[in-house]
Swiss-Prot record:
HAMAP family for this protein: TrhO
PANTHER family documented for this protein: RHODANESE-LIKE DOMAIN-CONTAINING PROTEIN 7-RELATED, THIOSULFATE SULFURTRANSFERASE/RHODANESE-LIKE DOMAIN-CONTAINING PROTEIN 2
Feature: compositional bias, Low complexity: 53-68
Organism phylogeny: Eukaryota, Viridiplantae, Streptophyta, Embryophyta, Tracheophyta
Provenance organism: Arabidopsis thaliana (Mouse-ear cress)
This protein's encoding gene: STR7
Enzyme active site: C328 (cysteine persulfide intermediate)
Signal peptide boundaries: none
Protein name as it appears in the record: Rhodanese-like domain-containing protein 7
CDD domains on file: RHOD_YceA (cd01518)
Residue ranges annotated for the Rhodanese domain, each copy included: 245-368
Lineage: superkingdom: Eukaryota
Region Disordered, residue ranges: 20-68, 179-198, 432-474
Length: 474
């Protein structure tokens, strides 16, 4: 969901599972319905997708939607008083959380909501996280909240409960990531003596929680696109294969090129974008969005997506926009992208519920249409089926994933460059990177989360590992 980069060590997640917390009774979920038809409530019948009858969900049409909640909470003074009351309730808890009593857990979450008073929410949320020794990073914006936090389960659940006391933020989309037993076994700072119960091997290497104020919780750069008003149809992992195997469906990977390079779904289109804000222009160019009368002229050749042609034969009926199925790592980018496509005239827009991570967790490898590894924004760098840690490492010069083969390339220099950034860096930039790397290796005093810490051991290259094994066998 939310990207958290730092200078030297990315944070860590382990086994991911989706928290399926249903909305309160009689409340309206902005993600229900769409194209999934179930004939029973609470039964065991499998929901059936009816793709041709899919309709985008319009939140504004529901009397109990979040927009109605916003109207009810429009008084800024009342909102601030409500926040202060909730914050005071938590501040009355004077005892410290004994972080020795529970295992660490990481939860990524987001919610699109009309949240103009987001700035007033920053201080009480940050104070609570620090009080409960919850680390991580959170973004607040007029369009909602997006974050990833780490702490013992009790503390993390208290923070999430605090956030959802605001009716507009209730029903967070959550992905839980318990720390693996291996990471827990080597965790040095999971004790009450640690400021945030986060030591050298903690998933997040921050000395405090970062709560930032931004214009968007995920940057697209088009204010008129609002997932609050309408989004596409969510498709569960178990139904995803059926959808993307349909020859009439165009599958689009909404992630960036450094992510798609190491893995994607079979037959998926790669926009080759370097940032999510580039996605709108790619859609406009590739689908040749040009209105002719009341119909959109566009032709998508799935065999070669780069070739999009227009039929000049007036006798042939104009082609309409195709059915779209999109996916990303955890779901937030797809949700906003689906709103964009609906605003551009696309009628059938689907996206993978829970993202790639949920798919890799639930779908057996023998039935999977996923190829390669999935890039993640944490210390694992990549994951495979079953969410097992992947084989990729991270280039600290450009924050891109690199393979063992990439580390054998002449362009690779630890902490400086890799085959993907070597030609893009000037010699001056490389020298500065070498100086920083030397300073870090000798003193560990580079600013940020690793300031004052001794550096980790420089990883051996695959060649060195092979030589070491050969030497030990002689």
């Amino acid at each position: 969901m939310l990207r958290f980069y730092h200078w030297r060590f990315p944070p860590s997640l382990a086994v991911v599972r989706m928290l399926s917390s249903p909305p309160p009774p009689h409340s309206h979920s902005p993600f229900s319905g769409g194209g999934v038809n179930s004939n029973s409530v609470g039964g065991n019948s499998k929901p059936e997708l009816q793709f041709p009858q899919s309709q985008p969900h319009k939140l504004s049409s529901s009397p109990s939607s979040s927009l109605k909640s916003t109207v009810a909470c429009s008084n800024a003074g009342a909102i601030r008083r409500s926040m202060a009351t909730v914050s005071q309730a938590f501040s009355e808890r004077t005892e410290s959380i004994d972080s020795d009593l529970g295992s660490l857990v990481v939860v990524s979450f987001y919610k699109f909501a009309d949240f103009p008073e987001h700035a007033d929410f920053r201080k009480p949320l940050k104070d609570l996280c620090e009080k409960l020794r919850v680390s991580g990073g959170i973004i607040l914006a007029p369009e909602g909240i997006n974050g990833s936090i780490c702490g013992i389960r009790e503390s993390v659940e208290e923070v999430l409960a605090f956030i959802q006391r605001d009716v507009r933020l209730n029903g967070l989309r959550q992905v839980e990531t318990p720390v693996s037993p291996e990471q827990e076994a080597i965790h040095h700072g999971h004790s009450s003596s640690s400021p945030l119960a986060a030591g050298e091997d903690a998933p997040f290497r921050w000395d405090h929680v970062r709560v930032k104020l931004k214009k968007e919780i995920v940057t697209l750069g088009i204010p008129s696109v609002s997932p609050i008003e309408r989004v596409g149809t969510y498709v569960s992992p178990e139904e995803w294969n059926e959808l993307i195997s349909d020859p009439e469906t165009v599958v689009i990977d909404v992630r960036n090129t450094y992510e798609t390079r190491i893995g994607k779904f079979k037959g998926a289109v790669d926009p080759c974008t370097t940032a999510f804000r580039n996605f709108p222009s790619w859609v406009e160019n590739q689908f040749a969005l040009k209105q002719e009368g009341n119909e959109t002229q566009a032709k998508v050749e799935k065999e070669d997506f780069s070739e999009i042609t227009h039929k000049e034969d007036k006798a042939e009926k104009p082609k309409t926009l195709p059915r779209i199925a999109m996916y990303c790592t955890g779901g937030i980018r797809c949700e906003k992208a689906s709103s964009l496509l609906l605003s551009q005239g696309f009628e059938e827009v689907y996206h993978l519920k829970g993202g790639i991570l949920k798919y890799l967790e639930e779908v057996p490898k023998t039935e999977s249409l996923w190829e390669g590894e999935c890039f993640v924004f944490d210390k694992r760098v990549s994951v495979e089926h079953g969410l097992a840690q992947g084989t990729h490492k991270l280039c600290y010069g450009c924050k891109q994933p690199i393979s063992d083969e990439d580390m054998e390339a002449p362009e690779y220099e630890y902490g400086v460059s890799c085959p993907y950034c070597y030609s893009k860096k000037s010699e001056e930039e490389k020298e500065r990177a070498r100086a920083r790397q030397t300073q870090f290796e000798e003193w560990g005093v580079i600013g940020g989360p690793d300031k004052g810490r001794r550096p980790a051991t420089k990883p051996d290259s695959p060649r060195k590992k092979i030589n070491a094994k050969l030497g030990s066998s002689i």
